[in-house]
């Protein structure tokens, strides 16, 4: 069985929109359980996106996620370079701002894809982003995933695939 690599929007959208921390305890308990079991993980860049807000979500993550939940991406530089090459090759389609944002060293998306590329047989990205190949103003995670054979699914599908309920 593989591992699910969660994007920052897995946490942020759940907290803001569908499963607020103060209401949906069972969801967050299940997230904690899956994290402790190593079924879901994330990367250092996602941690950086979540841990700069000084809010309830950041506090929950610090208190409930295992110390090794956020994996280091320094070992996926070769894969990251492939993602960079792809993004730059799409300059006739995407706006310069879209490419620059996608490749910003502080943004997680390109690094998530690179991390998953290191082992496409067992790593699946979890994101709420939806494919929109005609969009020129933003590179969505599904577009490069399709190019690099990286599997991606929405958050609720993780629970279905793992046959988990909350």
Regions found by a protein language model. Name each.
Residues 1-3, 14, 20, 35, ...:
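Feature 3881 marks metal-assisted phosphotransfer/nuclease machinery
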């Amino acid at each position: 069985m593989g591992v699910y690599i969660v994007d920052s929007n897995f946490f942020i959208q759940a907290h803001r929109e569908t499963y607020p921390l103060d209401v949906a305890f069972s969801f967050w308990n299940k997230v904690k359980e899956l994290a402790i079991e190593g079924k879901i993980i994330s990367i250092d860049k996602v941690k950086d996106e979540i841990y700069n807000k000084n809010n309830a979500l950041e506090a929950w993550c610090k208190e409930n996620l295992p110390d090794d939940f956020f994996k280091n991406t320094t070992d996926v530089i070769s894969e990251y370079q492939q993602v960079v090459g792809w993004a730059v090759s799409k300059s006739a389609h995407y706006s310069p701002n879209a490419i620059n944002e996608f490749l910003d060293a502080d943004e997680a998306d390109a690094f998530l894809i690179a991390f998953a590329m290191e082992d496409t047989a067992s790593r699946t990205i979890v994101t709420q982003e939806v494919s929109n190949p005609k969009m020129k103003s933003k590179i969505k995670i599904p577009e490069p995933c399709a190019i690099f054979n990286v599997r991606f699914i929405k958050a609720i599908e993780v629970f279905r695939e793992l046959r988990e309920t909350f």
